[in-house]
Amino acid sequence: MEIKRPKNFFGEDIPLTVFISEEQLHNKECIKVYGKYFEDTGIFNVFPNELSDRGEYLGDVFPEGSTPSANGFCGVINNDEIEFYWSGEKIVTESYGLYQSIFSRNKGILETDVMKKKCAVIIGCGSVGSLVAMELARAGVEKYVLCDADTLEYHNVCRHQCGIEDVGDLKVNALKRKILNINPKANVKTFGGIIQNIPKEILDEMCTPYETIFVGCGDNRTADVYANKIAIYFDAAFISIGFWERAYAGEIFYHIPHKNMPCYKCALGSGDLSGRVEANHHIYSNQEDVESVKFEPGISVDINFITSIGIKLIIDILNSTNEGYIPRLLNNLKQYTLVCNTSDPAIGGEMVEIFSYPLQVTTSLVVGFGKDCSGECSYELEEK
């Protein structure tokens, strides 16, 4: 390969550098390396093995005792590690522990050894689900089940974490690539269908009791009722993040098993308490024929504000059994929370009048058990 070397103020070549994981640096079986060269910095970023198919071919790695190539980039095994060269000149190598380096900035805030054991089952991988997945990946969650039947289209891009290069693929596949780009060690299972049809063996493999949370992101009450019931079966928590017209407001509901909480079906399954957009009508994120409705889709910043509050609750719930963890919101928000982006009727209509001011987050709403439950969730009483 040919490269352009960066120069300093005096026109001198800036030293070239290789970034590579400790695992790869000491891999004596390595024969080729893939990644990317950045000509503005003079850095060769050797991609982890799990992402090698996304990188450009950088060069070969030769056996111990070999003479470095006089032309281009190569590596030579020396004792128990690879030394890198550019046209025969040895290059500075900076190795890193992949997991430790990626999550080093979380130290003291989140315990990475705790977070890597957690699993998130994300139902709906659109604008909400994609943000949830990306932030949990950054927080160190290492196990995912992604469930969505939709294909990423161009009208999704302005509100989705994936981009134009992903258009045409299933949302679950596109999102899996994004997660692995943050943590190549993540274990991500995908299902290109609705939660009601997901094979049980996928969840049996991935869901660990009290270490798993199901996240309803599809604005579909039927799916949320079903997902909460499955979560209870696996002794897993459940949270739903949904939106009202134009995403001027949203609602967040969570259920933690064996905490004497009403499940989603009891609390919100009928839809009587909320102005949330009903099942399968993704008006806030995916509506294509905008002129056929009375309001417009919500913009990304409104969707993300409410979703971020839900993500904080997810992280709190996943760490609720960790004695050293300090909750951000869980001790202050009720099981059912409303969040508004604006209190202007010109955007939200008459329903917006229930909010006193913009960015209001409720802390006093209470939901109860349904008529089929006498003070305890009937789903939790069912035999597994």
Model segments located where?
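Generic beta-strand/beta-sheet core signal
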Residues: 123, 147-149, 191, 216-217, ...
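Generic structural signal for helix capping and beta-alpha/helix-loop junctions
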Residues: 153-154, 197-200, 248-250, 273
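Glycine-rich phosphate/adenylate-binding loop
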Residues: 1-90, 206-213, 217-384
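A short, basic/flexible loop-to-alpha-helix module at the beginning of a structural domain
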Residues: 92-120
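A structured beta-alpha segment of the ubiquitous adenosine-cofactor-binding alpha/beta core
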Residues: 176-212, 217-221
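Glycine-rich phosphate-binding loop and adjoining beta1-alpha1-beta2 segment
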Residues: 149-185
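Glycine-rich adenosine-cofactor-binding loop
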Residues: 110-153
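Beta1-alpha1 glycine-rich phosphate/pyrophosphate-binding loop at the start
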Residues: 32-46, 133, 148-161
